[in-house]
From Swiss-Prot:
It holds the Pfam family MMR_HSR1. GO terms for biological process: division septum assembly. GO terms for cellular component: cytosol. It comes from Jannaschia sp. (strain CCS1). Necessary for normal cell division and for the maintenance of normal septation. This is Probable GTP-binding protein EngB.
Length: 218
């Protein structure tokens, strides 16, 4: 049987799933919003970040992971929230919510400021172990997604693709979306070789993503 490039991540075994559940069932709190590098918290724990286009479902996914609906809040205006938001997972992890990219509603100076901060963060955060790049399963990889992937390649930060809203696409449409995503990822050396398929609404893939984060080593 031919092995597909960038296969879907398999569901974790019972022990690994429980490890992920415990990480996200503990104290999960918003720590701070950061607008400049000198505002970053101490680099004293494992750090993962979530990146994605505006309206990709990033805040909803973070809330599904933590089981807290109001923890991460989506901006009503795409491209306007330009803070790097830090959340603590127990005393061992930072979960970092990067601003949604897609700048149709944002002034040029805001776009430039955000791009500079993002580049500095990705290249200068030694404890950042993995980025999770969220892609809407209905639409696949867009040009702005390619831009963030290129930044991650340059910064040598491993990134893993998470397809969101998978419950909204079925059968051949889902297969086509996966094929397009795999083709795009083949051009990026920093791409982690598994894709996680999620639905925040249905809970699909949430245990897998929790377990993946819980097993990332220092």
């Amino acid at each position: 049987m031919t092995t597909l490039p960038f296969p879907l991540a398999e569901a974790p075994d019972a022990l690994t799933e429980e490890r992920g559940r415990k990480l996200f069932a503990g104290n999960t709190d918003f720590l701070k919003g950061v607008v400049a590098m000198d505002g970053l918290p101490p680099a004293d724990r494992i750090e993962v970040c979530f990146a994605g286009r505006s309206n990709v479902g990033k805040s909803t996914l973070i809330n599904a992971l933590t089981g807290r609906k109001g923890l991460a809040r989506a901006s009503n205006t795409p491209g306007r929230t330009q803070e790097i938001n830090y959340f603590t997972l127990l005393d061992s992890h930072y979960l970092v919510d990067l601003p949604g990219y897609g700048y149709a509603e944002a002034p040029l100076h805001v776009v430039q400021q955000w791009q500079a901060l993002l580049k500095s963060y990705l290249q200068g955060r030694a404890t950042l172990r993995r980025a999770f790049v969220l892609i809407d399963a209905r639409h696949g990889v867009k040009a702005v997604d390619e831009e963030i992937m290129k930044l991650l390649d340059i910064a040598a930060v491993p990134f893993q693709t998470v397809l969101t809203k998978s419950d909204k696409v079925k059968g051949r449409d889902r297969d086509a979306s996966l094929a397009r995503t795999r083709k795009a990822l083949a051009n990026h050396p920093a791409a982690y070789p598994e894709i996680i398929l999620t639905s925040s609404e249905k809970g699909d893939g949430i245990p897998t993503l929790r377990a993946t984060i819980a097993t990332i080593e220092t």
